[in-house]
A protein has these predicted regions:
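Nucleotide-activated chemistry modules centered on ATP-dependent adenylation/adenylyltransferase
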Residues: 1-190, 195-327
Length: 327
């Protein structure tokens, strides 16, 4: 279950603020995940509408009663499962091919059973051992059976379909609300080529049933696969490129030193500045521009405090909207 909770009163929050009188606390994201031993996937608990604050922990597909497993899980892809088999020194390096494997901050879950992996121990490995691990990986990666992972993905989608329909409908209705006071000429999607901005693009496009302008912030440091995806994406979407053609990242590193927590020049030079220039060219006479960002509150403690709608602190005349919110 994913819901917004008031950290002061520990009650569910429907909007952006607690309903208790005088409480201005920002809601935090609360996630509850259960494990279905029958379907072998994590399941988001659902609200029981009959009983206030009661959560249902039954799998909607098989009806199995599920046990609490974690607050946050990420699927482990086939390549990582092979690497885990090597690190756990399994005799059969493809032993996890058919296993549903998930990762949390505290360890890995193999068909719901937790096993811990010492990152500290891995980081202290001699380079020679790492080379041997890489050799084993390279010898076996082509023999991975992906059918188990593909089947798991389908089971996960089926078991959590109700939840995704719910949050998708909420997000689309929220986005459509901005269409009442803004035209398509006043808005754009900030597109990075990542999964979050892709989902945001899909939501915005479905909300308005029309093509919306996308701006791709080219930092010049993107992976080749990102540029390839951007080119494919641009065939069906209007994508503009915001790029600083005058500066070179490596050269600036030589001149002023690499960017760090105390000297964060990279975003200003290669992202904010380039996007500001593009906005001035595309939205010349616009007083305010609406921007849909692919940012999720659950990504970090700092982002959990972001308002869903806010004025950009870096780019003038820009209103930023977090379309996904709790997705």
């Amino acid at each position: 279950m994913i819901e917004k909770i008031c950290p002061i009163h520990n009650v569910p929050v429907e909007g952006e603020k607690c309903s208790k009188d005088g409480c201005d606390a920002r809601p935090i994201i609360s996630t509850t995940l259960y494990w279905c031993t029958e379907c072998r996937v994590p399941v988001f608990g659902e609200k029981d509408e009959r009983i206030k604050n009661k959560k249902i922990n039954r799998c909607p597909v098989c009806g199995n009663e599920c046990e609490y497993i974690s607050t946050d899980l990420r699927p482990v892809i086939p390549e990582e499962k092979l690497l885990l088999a090597i690190l756990f020194e399994e005799e059969d390096l493809h032993v996890f091919d058919e296993v549903s494997v998930w990762n949390s901050n505290s360890g890995y879950y193999f068909d719901g059973i937790k096993r811990e992996l010492s990152i500290k121990q891995i980081n202290s490995m001699p380079l020679s051992e790492i080379h041997e691990i890489k050799k084993k990986y390279d010898l076996n990666v082509e023999d991975i059976n992906r059918s188990g992972f593909d089947d798991m993905v389908q089971r996960f989608i089926a078991s959590n379909a109700n939840r995704y329909y719910e949050i998708t409908d909420e997000a689309i209705k929220y986005i459509q609300g901005f269409g009442e006071s803004n035209s398509l000429d006043d808005m754009f999607v900030s597109f990075s080529g990542g999964k979050d901005s892709t989902v945001t693009s899909d939501l915005v496009t479905r909300a308005f049933a029309k093509k919306v302008t996308h701006i791709f912030g080219d930092t010049t440091l993107e992976f080749p696969t990102t540029y390839e995806y951007r080119d494919r994406f641009a065939k069906s979407h209007r994508v503009l490129r915001a790029k600083n053609y005058e500066k070179n990242f490596e050269q600036l590193c030589e001149e002023i030193g690499p960017p760090s927590r105390v000297m964060r020049w990279c975003c200003t030079v290669f992202k904010t500045g380039a996007i500001t220039k593009t906005l001035s060219q595309v939205f010349k006479d616009k007083i305010n521009v609406l921007t849909f960002y692919g940012i999720r509150k659950s990504e970090s403690a700092s982002r959990s405090k972001y308002d869903r709608e806010s004025e950009s602190p870096k780019i003038t005349k820009q209103t930023v909207v977090m379309a996904m919110d709790i997705i």
